[in-house]
UniProtKB/Swiss-Prot annotation:
InterPro entries from the UniProt entry: Membr_insert_effic_factor_YidD
Entry's localization field: Cell inner membrane
Taxonomic lineage from the root: Bacteria, Pseudomonadati, Pseudomonadota, Gammaproteobacteria, Vibrionales
SMART domains the UniProt entry points to: Haemolytic
GO annotations of cellular component type: plasma membrane
Source organism of the structure: Vibrio atlanticus (strain LGP32)
UniProt xrefs under PANTHER family: MEMBRANE PROTEIN INSERTION EFFICIENCY FACTOR-RELATED (PTHR33383:SF1)
Record function comment: Could be involved in insertion of integral membrane proteins into the membrane.
Keywords: Cell inner membrane, Cell membrane, Membrane
Name listed for the protein in its UniProt record: Putative membrane protein insertion efficiency factor
Membrane topology of this protein: Peripheral membrane protein
Length: 85
């Protein structure tokens, strides 16, 4: 079962959903990646929480430009913390 989404992650999701519902339909598809950058950000925030989700989303947005070919780039799976190492 997935862990619940933190309140900070929910706050970070608000502008992403606003973009997906209101801005993206006006400008059309522009993302070079699958899943799209906004969907990637939603998945990253829900899976990894606020801090790591924002970090992963920011890295992804920096890669989304005309000089990058894009392609399939899924959100990395959640790693269990190994405290013995």
């Amino acid at each position: 079962m997935a862990s619940p989404v933190s309140p900070f992650a929910w706050i970070a999701l608000i502008p992403i959903y606003f973009y997906r519902w209101f801005i993206s339909p006006l400008i059309g598809p522009r993302c070079r990646f699958t899943p799209t950058c906004s969907l990637y950000a939603i998945e990253a925030l829900k899976a990894h929480g606020f801090v790591k989700g924002c970090w992963l989303s920011g890295k992804r947005l920096l890669k989304c430009h005309p000089l990058n070919e894009g392609g399939f780039d899924p959100v990395p799976p959640v790693q269990k913390q190994d405290r013995d190492k």
